[in-house]
Amino acid sequence: GDTKHVLLLPEDPAEAFEFAAVAFDLAERLQTTIFLMLDLDIGMNHRLCRPLRWDDARQYDRGKIMTAEMLDEGRDFGRYLDVDGDGIPYRTYPGTHPTKGSFFTRGTSRDRYARYTEEGSVYADNVQRLVRKFETAQDMVPRPLQANAAKPTKYGVIYFGSTSPAMDEAIELLEARGHHLNRLRIRAFPFHSSVASFAADHDFVYVVEQNSDGQLRSLIINENGIDPVRLVSIVHYDGTPITARFIAGAIGDHQDHLKVTPLRKAVS
C-alpha cells in the first residue's frame, strides 16, 4: 500500500503549532505531502501547554530550487534527476526562464527528465529514488526525545502524541512500585535511527498507543526488523483519553510477571 508518507506527531497544541511551520518547510524540502497528526484529545479538549511563540525572523525553506542563473550556466535540469544522491531533485518555479527549466509530467511512468516512458527499468529507477528520499527524511524530521530512568534498567517504553502527559505521570507511579523504565517519545515518521537503537538497548520495550491495532508497534517492527517478542503492545481504545493509571497498571502487571521466579521441577 501507499504508506511511505512523512508524519509529524506533536504531544500538545504548542508543539502542534511549532510543527505546523516545520511541516511547510519539510513539504518544500522533500517535495511531498506532510501529515501533521492531531488526535481528538489535542484538537478538541482544553490542555495546558507552553505559550505559542513565533519568531518573526524565521525564513521559509524552499528546498532545492534551480534558478535562471543556474540554467544559464548550463546546469543539467531534470525534474526527477537525483544529482546529490539524497533522492531529492531540483525544481523550478513557473516562469523561471524563457526557454529552459519547464517540463510536462504525469502521475504514471516518466524518466528523470519528466518524459513519458513505459520502460520498466526507468520506473524502478524512480521508485528507488523515492526510497532514498524517504531515507533522507529520517534526518530532517523532528527527532525522538529520550529520558532515562533514575536507575539503570533493561526495560523501555515508546509512545507518541497526546499519550505524553499521562506517560510522565505513569513513570512516577511505576517508580513508586519499583519499576524503572527509560522512555522514548517518537515525534515523526520515518523513524530516526535512534528508535532502532533504543529497542536494541533494552530486553523489552513497551509500545503505548491509543488505537486497537498497535499501529506504531507494527511500524517499528516493519521498518527496523525488530523481533516482535521484544516489543510489548499496550493499547487503549475505549474512546476516552489514556490515563496514567491505565499505563502504570498495564506495564506494572507485566513487570511483576517478569519478576516471578518459576518453581523448579520436582526431582523424584
Task: Name each model-derived stretch.
Residues 14-17:
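Active-site glycine- and acidic-residue-rich loops that bind
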Residues 1-11, 229-237:
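Short beta-alpha connecting loops at secondary-structure transitions
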Residues 19, 24-268:
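Flexible, low-complexity linker and terminal segments
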